[in-house]
């Protein structure tokens, strides 16, 4: 199987090393920094396992790595989808599956605009790994696995060719966990993961912030999670679940926050988020100034999770005349913060 990964962030590093270590796979990489990468990669996990793999080709030119790919997997922030899709589109075979490791940042919506009509698509509902770069282009840490994966497919595999469906199934088997096929792309596109998780935390941290305000320290994003953030997160999830029902999704097709985190209320959710091993050591997105700490409005938490994440449930709710007061206030605040830097 020939796979091309697009993007060299945390997930791109781990997937490059992990997938290229699997028997029968050939992995290439499309990246804007090809000279920073070694062809030999090492990925270590918290149980002491080490995955060693080799990349066949590393290039900034889609013509080098896209035409031979059977699977193209985007490991990109949502704001990079358009430019990369437009760059790879001329080199795609009609049978090549194009997927995204993150679907909740507009993957299916953007693909419909920037990839050839009828291109086979797939997207993960949640990322398969918690990932961190250890040494750029050389080593990465796989900090957490998922017990199962859920994937949306367009067109549904029942409408795909038999060989195409088999190819996608073989690729997904490389993750060695059960894989569930989702009923609708909305189940992957409308996520209560980062678009709600991150934005609810950011809002409760800094909704009263002004440029003149500095803070004495930088709190941990998850280890210092607050009850206030949990209450807002759950309120936004309630609105997302209502939207899912309006869109005709089966009950439970997007697991509630409480179900996903095995919690019963805001208090137990707070304790859960504070205790997740893979989340430990992740700071809030801040920058240090001479006077103290301030929010880093240039971070991906802002530039991805608001305009490329929360935007889509907010937009769909407007289209269906659904009141979502909590999503509205968080989305408008986040966009105001981003626009204040432009």
Language model feature labels by segment:
Residues 216, 223, 230-342:
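NAD(P)-dependent Rossmann-like dehydrogenase/reductase catalytic/cofactor-binding core
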Residues 31-33, 62, 102, 125, ...:
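Residues at the C-termini of beta-strands that transition into short coil/loop
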């Amino acid at each position: 199987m020939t796979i091309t990964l697009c993007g060299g962030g945390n997930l791109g590093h781990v997937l490059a090393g992990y997938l290229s270590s699997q028997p029968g796979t050939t992995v290439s990489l499309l990246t804007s920094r090809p000279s920073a990468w070694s062809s030999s990669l090492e990925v270590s996990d918290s149980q002491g396992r080490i995955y060693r793999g080799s990349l066949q080709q590393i290039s900034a030119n889609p013509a080098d790595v896209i035409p031979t790919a059977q699977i193209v997997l985007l490991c990109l922030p949502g704001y990079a989808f358009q430019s990369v899709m437009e760059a790879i589109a001329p080199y795609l075979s009609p049978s090549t599956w194009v997927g995204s490791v993150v679907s909740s940042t507009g993957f299916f919506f953007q693909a419909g605009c920037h990839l050839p009509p009828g291109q086979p698509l797939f997207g993960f509902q949640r990322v398969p790994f918690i990932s961190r770069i250890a040494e750029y282009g050389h080593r990465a840490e796989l900090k957490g696995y998922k017990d199962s994966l859920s994937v949306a497919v367009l067109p549904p595999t029942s409408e795909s060719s038999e060989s195409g469906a088999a190819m996608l199934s073989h690729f997904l088997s490389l993750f060695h966990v059960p894989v569930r096929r989702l009923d609708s792309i909305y189940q992957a596109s409308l996520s209560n993961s980062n678009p709600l998780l991150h934005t609810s935390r950011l809002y409760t941290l800094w909704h009263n912030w002004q440029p003149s305000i500095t803070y004495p320290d930088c709190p941990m994003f998850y280890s210092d999670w607050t009850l206030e953030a949990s209450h807002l997160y759950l309120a936004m999830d309630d609105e997302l679940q209502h939207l899912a029902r309006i869109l005709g999704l089966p009950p439970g097709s997007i697991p509630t926050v409480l179900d996903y985190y095995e919690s019963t209320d805001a208090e137990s959710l707070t304790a859960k988020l504070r205790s997740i091993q893979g989340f430990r050591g992740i700071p809030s997105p801040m920058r240090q100034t001479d006077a103290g700490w301030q929010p880093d409005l240039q971070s991906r938490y802002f530039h991805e999770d608001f305009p490329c994440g929360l935007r889509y449930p907010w937009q769909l709710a407007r289209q269906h005349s659904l009141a979502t007061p909590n999503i509205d206030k968080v989305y408008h605040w986040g966009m105001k913060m981003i626009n204040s830097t432009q």
